[in-house]
Design a protein with these regions (language model features):
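Conserved N-terminal structural module of periplasmic/extracytoplasmic solute-binding proteins
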Residues: 7-8, 21-178, 212-213, 223-226, ...
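Hydrophobic core
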Residues: 10-18
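Conserved small-residue motifs centered on glycine
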Residues: 36, 349-465, 470
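Paired acidic/hydrophobic, glycine-rich loop segments that form the ligand-binding mouth/hinge
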Residues: 89-93, 278-283
């Protein structure tokens, strides 16, 4: 990072006159990073950014040097970086989930195994609180190589227009049949009371994520499911077929827009905001944002013009909902950049300290008196200004948000909508979110690293075509056979080979632990007997 401080030049001049033993007495170690640039070259380059940088360095005890990578070609940037062994950063920030490039590099020893470090709560009080289930998706060959940028595990679910439901006398849906009845009523029973047939129950665009959520209601799992000791892709289960048959009925009965496959993803949620749809199946914070829109744009309830329209952030249906991977992006510690264990500890300490409360405030809100002020009741009040001009712009890309803000120190006063979302996560979605048991094994599969995108696309397109009636059951089966022949069967074999090895290791660990406990019990009994004899 190019930082131009007048003081730096003065310090350098003074250092030249000091004794060698004193010259570097206060010099901080440097941590180097590769970070994606989302802000057109403005990240940590705005007015006031130098102050932000200095605050980070003073707080963490480390200087830091960032190479910003073009987000539009970031995968290529990472690939090039991994080949430049002489200029390797200590920390590489990655987006999304692991791909073949990262897996291949990990298998060649490009990254440190962080398993033991992330168990050390004394050295890393924040990072050690990471959800161990989430780490399974960042594991290659039994080694945890990534630190996740945490996202809510129970983020997906079902939300709907509460005032529409009230007008039509509908209760809270619990079963799949309840959902169908609500979709039907929202489509055909004039929920907005305008005497015009202009609504569809379920909002849909070409983004098909809602279908994955619906599938969990039927018990078919999340991508893969464990059956009889084997991991099986969900499209090979009876429950999957039941789920897409139900979705086909929803489509055939006109309960979603007939042209949903042509509606661009950028329009997602606009149907609910504009009063064209009443059910939103996606991230729960998306339902909250629709509710925010109603409040901010004075959209009135259809049952009470003195109140705003509202969304019920329900969450699961039939006691289930889809889990996220638990993260969106991650950090790698490279073996060529962090050459020693001391380097690894420095890199992890830097990342850990960035998750302290003061650093979260700096990353999220910037400088007090410049971009925010504290209110008398201890809440943050932001100061108006262009987000792209904020001095902290881009700093949040280095924050894992583990464990995030303490519940008793939330910087923004929660609204009714915020409280409803928190309640949904804590009491409803998080406890029942269905995880993908194959997540860790997919990242280590050679077939998936090469052909995963194509294989996923075959299944997704076949599902869409079947729901819309473009293909029949035979066409659906043909697509599944195509999936199997183009690498699907190999993928199943690789995933289950890794799964079986993992199960054997876990069983061996359990046996060792049991033997250790038994030996300790016998030793204690022997000591007690000896003591009594004496």
């Amino acid at each position: 990072m190019n930082k131009k401080f007048v003081a730096a030049g003065m310090a350098a001049a003074m250092a030249a006159t000091m004794l060698p033993s004193m010259a570097f007495a206060d010099e901080k170690p440097t941590v180097t990073l590769l970070v994606p640039e989302y802000n057109a070259g403005k990240s940590l380059k705005n007015e006031g950014s130098d102050q932000v940088i200095q605050m980070v360095e003073d707080y963490t005890g480390f200087n830091f040097d960032i190479k910003w990578g073009d987000n539009g070609a970031y995968d290529q940037v990472i690939g090039t970086t991994l080949m430049d062994f002489d200029n390797m950063p200590m920390i590489i920030t990655c987006g999304g989930s692991m791909n073949g490039t990262i897996v291949s590099a990990a298998e060649e020893g490009a990254f440190w195994d962080l398993s033991e470090y992330l168990d050390d709560s004394e050295k890393f009080p924040n990072l050690s609180q990471v959800n161990k289930e989430t780490l399974k998706g960042l594991t290659v060959g039994g080694e945890v190589i990534g630190i996740p940028r945490v996202r809510e595990l129970g983020r997906y679910g079902f939300s709907y227009r509460q005032d529409w439901a009230d007008k039509l006398g509908l209760g809270t849906p619990e079963t799949i049949q309840d959902v169908y009845d609500m979709l039907y009523a929202f489509t055909y029973n004039d929920p907005d009371g305008n005497n015009v047939d202009d609504t569809y129950g379920m909002e849909m665009t070409k983004y098909t994520g809602p279908f994955d959520i619906v599938q969990t209601w039927f018990g078919c799992g999340n991508g893969w499911v464990e059956q009889d000791g084997q991991l099986v892709p969900v499209h090979q289960t009876a429950e999957y077929k039941e789920a897409i048959d139900w979705l086909k009925k929803v489509y055939d009965d006109g309960l979603m827009s007939p042209d949903w496959v042509t509606i661009d993803t950028s329009e997602w949620s606009n149907g609910c905001k504009k009063g064209q749809n009443g059910v939103y199946i996606d991230v729960m914070d998306g339902g909250r944002r629709i509710w925010d829109y109603f409040v901010n744009n004075d959209v009135k309830s259809v049952t009470n013009p003195d109140e705003f329209a509202s969304m019920n952030l329900l969450g699961p249906i039939n006691g289930k909902t889809l889990a996220t991977s638990g993260y969106n992006g991650y950090y790698l510690i490279t073996t060529d950049g962090a050459k020693t264990e001391e380097d690894v500890i420095n890199a992890l300490t830097f990342l850990d300290k960035l998750n302290d409360y003061d650093m979260l405030i700096l990353a999220d809100y910037g400088l007090e008196g410049v971009t925010y002020n504290w209110t008398e009741d201890g809440q943050i009040e932001t100061i108006e200004g262009e987000t792209s001009d904020r001095p902290n712009l881009g700093l949040n890309q280095m924050v894992a948000y583990i464990p995030g803000y303490p519940e008793d120190k939330k910087p923004l006063k929660p609204t009714e909508r915020d409280d409803a979302l928190t309640e949904c996560y804590e009491q409803r979605t998080r406890p029942v979110a269905v995880t993908n048991p194959a997540l860790a094994y997919l990242s280590g599969s050679e077939t998936y690293s090469k052909y995963g995108a194509d294989l996923d696309n075959i299944l997704s397109e076949a599902r869409t075509q079947y729901i819309c009636g473009v293909i029949d059951e035979q066409g659906l089966q043909d697509a599944w056979d195509d999936w199997a022949n183009k690498g699907g069967n190999d993928l199943i074999a690789e995933v289950n080979e890794a799964y079986a090895a993992d199960q054997e290791t876990a069983e061996a660990d359990e046996n060792t632990e049991a033997a250790t406990e038994e030996a300790a019990t016998e030793e204690a009994a022997t000591e007690e007997a000896t003591s009594q004899a004496e």
